[in-house]
Regions:
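Short, surface-exposed loop/turn segments at secondary-structure junctions
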Residues: 32-39
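Extended, charge-biased low-complexity segments
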Residues: 68-70
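Active-site recognition of the HExxH zinc-binding catalytic motif
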Residues: 12, 119-136
């Protein structure tokens, strides 16, 4: 599985071992279910778990606690949305999505989109980053670092920015 994703295959031996440990934890703690008749294979489970484990490679796996299901659609899925404008008018629309993370609820992925990592975007990592971000109770781009009091938010942001630049 690691060889299927260049950004995972590039990890050193220690990082690969840690990624496998995090992946095993994730597979033991989350159910991965297919939607719209999708049969989720072992490769799919391992693929999702390995990619999802990258954001917590050197963090506590407990950061992914508080929810228990990953739902995988064969391709993009449609989500009904509504938005209220400044005049109070509610606009309802349907959005095509590759992924969705709900606070306290499941994480939803399009399998087709999990196979597309272009221009530095990876839907698995993106949605799992939202799960980290939502631990603080709202999505503001900064995950709760309570499990790691030694990590300083300013340093964390700088490391994230530097890592993203290298990833892209």
């Amino acid at each position: 599985v690691l060889d299927a994703y260049p950004f995972l295959a590039a990890l050193n031996a220690d990082e690969s071992a840690q990624l496998l440990a995090r992946s095993a934890w994730l597979l033991a703690s989350k159910t991965i279910n297919g939607a719209q008749g999708l049969e989720v294979s072992d490769f799919m489970r391992l693929s999702i778990a390995a990619q999802a484990s990258l954001p917590i490679l050197n963090l506590a796996p407990e950061l992914y606690e508080g929810w228990d299901e990953i739902i995988v659609y064969p391709a993009s899925f449609r989500i009904p949305r509504s938005r209220q404008d400044d005049d109070g008018v509610v606009h309802e629309y349907i959005e095509d999505a590759a992924g969705e993370a709900w606070e306290g609820g499941p994480l939803v992925l399009s399998w087709e989109d999990t196979q597309l990592s272009e221009g530095g975007f990876n839907v698995v990592i993106h949605e799992f980053a939202h799960k980290l971000d939502l631990r603080s109770g709202f999505a503001d781009g900064m995950p709760s670092l309570a499990a790691h009091p030694d990590l300083k938010p300013k340093v964390w942001r700088q490391v994230l920015d530097d890592s993203l630049d290298r990833f892209i």
